[in-house]
Curated annotation (Swiss-Prot):
UniProt record similarity statement: Belongs to the UPF0210 family.
Protein name: UPF0210 protein MMP1427
CDD domains: RNR_PFL_like_DUF711
Pfam (any one): DUF711
InterPro entries the UniProt entry points to: UPF0210 (IPR007841)
Length: 458
């Protein structure tokens, strides 16, 4: 039974503090779609996704209306395409294999537009130890795919705590991101490419979502968003000790998560599929007040990025997890605080005044999910430097047994002090400086950084 105060509190959260369900993502298994014939493969994929996901948008809108809770994005994630291309590309030349992968990606884009979802994720490869031929071709095809599609997101898992870091793949992904930046408008294609360590199989958030090989046939995963709500709570705690702040954030996260699970289960029930997880991640938007940086500043920092930022973020992330885990037994995905620069108005301001630099963002990723996200850098940045930034982030994830990722955008013709405007959820990215010193010799070595001693857990 809800008391009137709780109902009023929820209305306030939605109306004034930007509380919403960021995404309901339908994960779909495509392993049974594999076929030697490319046309049959595409037909199988089309039939499977449209039959299971054709009503996703309509259903999510209906549930949103029923509860009065906005569901901002409706998305689909699929089995990593690298896992189902083997028989299709067997015997083809490299060029033909790349084109076959792109055709599958174009089919995914067509489906996304037909069913009305915002994005479709799963143009992915899992290459933490080595890449198969079809995965190499899929990775090579990513830049071309980004010029021909609007809604397809690509991700590549290049490292895990158990396997170490595949430095060949890290080198290649730096080159792929660089090439994509040069052939898509304002390097927008790079905003749809994520490089992962320890990628979760049930992530509902783009651009890194895919339907993991250990998942069932179809599942709904939900992601919540409530930085504005948390900030409003913290602002009422002036002068209180940090333990009290943590406790109040925990209580707020409980309420947010409970709402996410309610909506996710309802959408799953209506679609006749299983409910998977609710992702506890606090996901910011470019809207004023809907910012992770603003929460940290409300805790007591003059600007996000100053000394103490990592400690405040660690407290926030831990409190959100504790509150969320109490609210739901089905917690998964990334589940932490996102720090995407272009999507967070407070982060953008911190970069502008010189408080927040790439090195500090890297330190922050040690204590939160998911990594260096939506970072715009000068267009002249060499591929080897992009790879080195990725390698650093992969190392943090590997050693700390957590998910880390890089979504970095070298913007042609732009330099430090410039901006690139994407609009919508992707926001505005200030160009951030990178080191002028080279990492090329390290990246050229290739090989695999061995798994750390903490991987030996048996």
């Amino acid at each position: 039974m809800f008391v009137p105060e709780e109902i009023i509190e929820t209305i306030k959260m939605i109306e004034y503090q930007n509380l919403d369900i960021r995404t309901t993502t339908l994960g779909i298994n495509l392993k049974d779609c594999a076929d030697k014939d490319l046309d049959l493969l595409k037909e199988n994929i089309y039939d499977k996704i449209t039959s299971l996901g054709g009503n996703l948008v309509e259903t999510a809108n209906k549930v949103s209306q029923k509860y009065g809770i906005p569901i901002v994005n409706k998305r689909i994630s699929v089995t990593p395409i690298g896992l189902i291309m083997g028989s299709t590309v067997k015997g083809l030349s490299d060029e033909e294999a790349v084109d076959a992968c792109v055709e599958v990606g174009i089919t995914l884009d067509k489906i996304a537009k037909e069913v009305g979802v915002d994005f479709i994720g799963g143009y992915s490869a899992l290459v933490q130890k080595r890449a198969t031929y079809e995965e190499k071709m899929l990775i090579r095809s990513i830049p071309k795919l980004m010029t021909k599609t609007d809604k397809v997101c690509a991700s590549v898992n290049v490292a895990t705590t158990k396997a170490g870091i595949n430095m060949y793949a890290v080198k290649k992904m730096g080159e792929i991101v660089k090439e994509t930046s040069e052939i898509t408008k304002d390097a927008i294609g790079c905003a749809k490419i994520v490089v992962f360590c320890n990628a979760p199989e049930d992530n509902p958030f783009m651009a890194g979502a895919f339907h993991g090989p250990g998942e069932g046939d179809a599942v709904i995963n939900a992601g919540v968003s409530g930085p504005g709500v948390v900030r409003a709570v913290v602002e009422q705690l002036k002068g209180k000790d940090i333990g009290t702040v943590s406790d109040e954030i925990k209580k707020t996260a409980f309420k947010i998560t409970r709402m996410g699970e309610l909506v996710g289960k309802e959408v799953a029930n209506e679609l006749g599929v299983n409910f998977g997880i609710v992702d506890l991640s606090l996901a910011p938007t470019p809207a004023i007040g809907d910012s992770i940086a603003n929460i940290l500043e409300a805790v007591g920092l003059e600007r996000c990025g100053t000394h103490g930022t990592t400690a405040a973020l660690a407290m926030l992330n831990d409190a959100v997890k504790k509150g969320g885990a109490m609210a739901s037994s089905n917690v998964g995905g990334l589940s932490g605080a996102f720090i995407p620069v272009s999507e967070d108005a407070g982060m953008i301001e911190a970069v502008e005044v010189g408080a927040l630099r790439l090195e500090k963002l890297e330190a922050m990723t040690c204590v939160c999910s998911v990594g260096l996200d939506m970072i715009a850098v000068p267009g002249k940045t060499p591929a080897s430097t992009l790879s080195a930034i990725m390698a650093d982030e992969m190392a943090i994830g590997m050693i700390n047994k957590k998910t880390t990722a890089v979504r970095i955008i070298p913007v042609p013709g732009k330099d430090v002090g410039d901006y690139v405007e994407y609009g919508g959820l992707l926001g505005t990215a200030p160009i951030m400086p990178v080191s002028e010193f080279s990492s090329e010799e390290l990246i050229e070595r290739g090989g695999r950084i061995p798994a750390p001693i903490q991987s030996l857990t048996n």
